[in-house]
């Protein structure tokens, strides 16, 4: 386990974990200790002596309480030899007993945690655990996780283990600790549903890298590791060329039935399509998604809805997670920031809202936060640098050019510079530290103009106009471009889409969607651009499609269960309770697959 040398450090304060003493009492007793006055105990460590007061040490450590009060120790005894700890660590322990603070650094954290564990000083243990959580990175996550084998740090262990699972692909590329895993440890990691890999190829390649580190002693473990790969989810070409023909696999008799079963599962999947049984077969069972796409509210059946659905991209399924106590809302904005989903502005067929609600997806609770300065229906919302930006919209009387931003720490909205144009039914995103807003309706016409906001200068700048007028547009940053998708040009709902290059200040067309739509949800999940629901010119829709910039093609995804437009989407990554929002992997009873699916001409599945 390696951390950056003493570049990072913290002084841990823990006034509430052990018995509390007033600051004045602590200061007085510490002065007495340093002066050697009224001390009634000497702690001896490897020849070093530390004067102290028994009462003070007892107040922070049950170890010292037991040591000083046990029947076999004379209460008059003054000198105690303490084994198993260095003088440096004992010095920190004693200072903590008097001051309730301790400096924690990358250089001392392991020894300090071990010492605190030995003396049962839970305040320091917790402080060290919090420090190690903050230091987690690709290089040390395995070492920190293994470190918790020796000490009771369940929260740190969970945090480190989930860091490994969530960052597996990147960790394998750079971590020396990965190569030192035992076969059991590697097997336990790659069999987890929570393992965050977009393609199972990455799991197989990780196995090969691990074996290649010590091929003579590890090649026989291929038979243990290969069944943990979801082989039937691989592209057939990769499976045939890279897995079936691999020398380690071919040389293993135990791998032959695994390969045969994988081929059967791939055939069934190709011929019959996905089925519920795929969730119980370890070769076809989708991993849990790292990020969940939420589709929130909207207009359905002639009125606003409170429906919330969660999209599981790894399983291509929607899960209804509607909170019945939540009120209906349409033409609102949604944003995810620091663990919360924010629902901003909107319309309920009676009122235009300036209110903002915050949803905790772990606790599943809603709370009202500070309202905006203006009522904003058809609002454009985005997140940048820990602020939520809300721009334009319609307040029930006029289309707005005003904009404001919300800071969660202060629970306040602050007005920023107004835009150059009134824009309702526009859409916004962020790219390279700037806010982009495109299209919309100014009260007279649908707009093809776009502008960018610089947070440092608090100024809006007009950029190159789009190729089409677009109100009810979807705008999202994807790769190195700003994408403007669909919308209404004043006559028709659009299938067209275009991408803006900030470097060249130009727009280029991309392939058209399968379906025209305006007032839909848009987000990026697993490196795919998703468009969700909307209005097609005749009716609200529930269909979903996604665009892959690598193939420059659109693909059909699973329909929502509810027809709706005027919804808003946001993506929530790294949920501790992601299983509650994903399609169930055990005893699956989720949504039935569609009877008919329209696919891109070049493929019959979502790209992976």
Swiss-Prot record:
Pfam families: BACK (PF07707), Beta-prop_ATRN-LZTR1 (PF24981), BTB (PF00651), Kelch_1 (PF01344). Signal peptide: none annotated. This is Kelch-like protein 10. Pathway: Protein modification; protein ubiquitination. Kelch repeats lie at residues 292-339, 340-386, 388-433, 434-480, 481-527, 529-574. GO terms for biological process: cell morphogenesis; fertilization; homeostasis of number of cells within a tissue; male genitalia morphogenesis; male gonad development; proteasome-mediated ubiquitin-dependent protein catabolic process; protein ubiquitination; spermatid development. May be a substrate-specific adapter of a CUL3-based E3 ubiquitin-protein ligase complex which mediates the ubiquitination and subsequent proteasomal degradation of target proteins during spermatogenesis. Coiled coil: none annotated.
């Amino acid at each position: 386990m390696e951390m950056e040398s003493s570049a990072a450090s913290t002084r841990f304060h823990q006034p509430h974990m052990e018995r509390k003493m007033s600051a004045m009492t602590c200061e007085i007793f510490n002065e007495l200790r340093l002066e050697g006055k009224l001390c009634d105990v000497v702690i001896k460590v490897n020849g070093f002596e530390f004067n102290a007061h028994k009462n003070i040490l007892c107040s922070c450590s049950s170890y010292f309480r037991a040591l000083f009060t046990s029947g076999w120790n004379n209460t008059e005894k003054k000198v105690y030899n303490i084994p198993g700890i260095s003088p440096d660590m004992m010095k920190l322990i004693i200072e903590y007993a008097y001051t309730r603070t301790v400096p924690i650094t990358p250089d001392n954290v392991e020894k300090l945690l071990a010492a605190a564990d030995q003396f049962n000083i839970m305040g320091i243990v917790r402080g060290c655990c919090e420090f190690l959580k903050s230091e987690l990175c690709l290089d040390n996550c395995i070492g920190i996780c293994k470190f918790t084998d020796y000490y009771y740090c369940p929260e740190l262990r969970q945090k480190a283990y989930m860091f490994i699972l969530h960052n597996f692909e990147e960790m394998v590329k750079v971590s020396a600790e990965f190569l030192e895993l035992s076969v059991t440890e590697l097997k336990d990691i790659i069999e987890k549903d929570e393992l965050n890999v977009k393609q199972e190829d990455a799991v197989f390649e990780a196995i090969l890298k691990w074996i290649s580190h010590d091929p003579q002693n590890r090649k026989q473990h291929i038979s243990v590791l290969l069944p943990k790969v979801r082989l039937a989810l691989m592209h057939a070409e990769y499976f045939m060329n890279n897995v079936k023909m691999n020398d380690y696999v071919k040389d293993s008799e135990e791998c032959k039935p695994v390969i045969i079963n994988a081929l059967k599962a791939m055939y069934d999947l190709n011929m019959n399509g996905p089925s519920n049984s795929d969730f119980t077969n370890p070769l076809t069972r989708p991993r849990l998604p790292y990020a969940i796409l939420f589709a929130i509210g909207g207009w359905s059946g002639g009125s606003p809805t409170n429906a919330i659905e969660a999209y599981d991209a790894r399983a291509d399924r929607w899960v209804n997670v509607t909170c019945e106590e939540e009120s209906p809302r349409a033409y609102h904005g949604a944003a995810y920031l620091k663990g919360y989903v924010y629902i901003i502005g909107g319309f309920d067929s009676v009122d235009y809202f300036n209110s903002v609600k915050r949803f905790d997806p772990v606790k599943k609770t809603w709370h009202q936060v500070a309202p905006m300065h203006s009522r904003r229906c058809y609002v454009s919302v985005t997140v940048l640098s820990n602020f939520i930006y809300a721009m334009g919209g319609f307040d029930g009387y006029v289309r707005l050019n005003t904009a404001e931003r919300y800071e969660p720490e202060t629970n306040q909205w602050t007005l920023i510079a107004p835009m150059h144009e009134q824009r309702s039914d526009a859409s916004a995103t962020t790219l390279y530290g700037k806010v982009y807003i495109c299209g919309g309706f100014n009260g007279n016409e649908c707009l093809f103009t776009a502008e960018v906001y610089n947070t440092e200068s608090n100024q809006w700048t007009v950029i190159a106009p789009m190729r089409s007028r677009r109100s009810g547009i979807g705008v999202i940053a994807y790769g190195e471009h700003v994408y403007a998708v669909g919308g209404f040009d004043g006559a028709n709902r659009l299938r067209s889409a275009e991408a803006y290059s900030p470097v060249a200040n130009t727009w280029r067309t991309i392939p058209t969607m399968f379906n025209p739509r305006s007032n839909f949800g848009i987000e990026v999940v697993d490196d795919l651009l998703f468009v969700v629901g909307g209005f097609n010119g005749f009716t609200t829709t529930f269909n979903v499609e996604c665009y892959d910039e690598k193939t420059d093609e659109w693909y059909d995804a699973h329909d929502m269960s509810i027809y709706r437009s005027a919804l808003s989407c946001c993506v929530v990554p790294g949920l501790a309770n992601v299983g509650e929002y994903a399609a169930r992997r055990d005893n699956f009873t989720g949504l039935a697959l569609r009877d008919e699916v329209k696919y891109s001409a070049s493929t019959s599945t979502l790209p992976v």
